[in-house]
Amino acid sequence: CNERGETFVVHAERTPTLLICGAGPDAEPVCTFAAALGWRVTLVDHRPAYVDAARFPGAERVVRIDAESLANDIQLSEFDAAIVMSHHLVADGHYLAALADSNVGYVGLLGPAARRERLFAELGARADRLRSRLRAPVGLDLGGRSPEAIALSIIAEVQAVLHDRAGAPF
């Protein structure tokens, strides 16, 4: 309240949180774009050689975990979105299984639709819990094949979903 008894309300948006499962070279521009938007980014990978915080200066955390222990090692409820992009079928299956049992609202999977269907078959009943939240192939069709173009399409889709937008022109 001010001296006239007026109350002002300031709307403050919560900072989006992004989990990237897979710290390969193509995750670098995804992390960079997310950090440029002010998002809090955590990267995880099961491969020790990929877990190098120096490659991801925009990330809050870069963590080596076993893919099958994602839900035990990372508090998934703190994330608004997750992108699975390790390029390792078995690891991606473990990441998706943990995310299926979570409340993460947006889950993206890098790769073609055939890969998604193969992983869904392996997930069994868990696939049903994930189907409505999963975007696979991840990203908007913006054109371009470079890691940066793909990262832009991914982050654009996450931004649209988090803000309940279609990602269509104004």
Language-model features: where?
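Segments forming oxygen-rich coordination pockets for charged ligands
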Residues: C1-H46, Y50-V63, S77-A81, E122, ...
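Fold-independent oxyanion-binding glycine-rich loops
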Residues: A23, H46, A67, S86-H88, ...
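Short beta->alpha junction loops/turns
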Residues: A23, H88-L89, P112, G143
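Short acidic/glycine-rich loop or secondary-structure boundary segments that cap or lie
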Residues: E28-P29, Y50-A53, A71-D73, A91-G93, ...
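ADP-ribose/adenylate-binding Rossmann-like module
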Residues: V44-D45, A81, S86-H87, G93, ...
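Short amphipathic alpha-helix with an adjacent loop that forms part of the alpha/beta core around
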Residues: E68-E78
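Adenosine-phosphate binding glycine-rich loop
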Residues: G105, L109-F170
